[in-house]
Amino acid sequence: LVKEKNLESNIHVKTYPFVKNLRYGENPHQKASWYGLNNIGWNAAKQLQGKELSYNNLLDLESALSTILEFEYDQKQNSSENTNAAVILKHNNPCGAALADSPSDAFRKALDCDSTSAFGGIVAFNNNVDLAAAELLSNIFLECVVAPSFDKEALKILHNKKNLRLLQLNKENIKKD
């Protein structure tokens, strides 16, 4: 139509390959599908356990990642300037964010911001999730936890929460715009 009418178009359309169908759309009765580039962003994340992701999970994960990337992501473990950040979101709204010397302290402080709203939320860490953080995470109902890595001991604790979605997203797979 644009060509037929000799109109100029400022619309640009991109297409992406199908990744998979999601658990559900914005509401449980709606269907949703996921399209994206290989090895970039959430398409490159490794889901370590839990139910299939929903549309809302992806929205919350993207918001959580956007916030956590304000801090250095996946720092060297023994860095003297290692700042651990934790962010909690639910329904695309922040419930808490905090910095601390350890992932567990960062999560505890973020949870203290609004522990009621954090119930059923998404948690993002900028560094490895260790045993102490996993023990705290296991005490609350959460939809997803995303981090650059998880200790083996942390995975053992979190494995008991079968429906909890654990996602590992490596620094090199984060899309930079």
Each model region followed by its residue ranges:
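Active-site loops and adjacent core secondary-structure elements that bind or stabilize anionic groups
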Residues: L1-D177
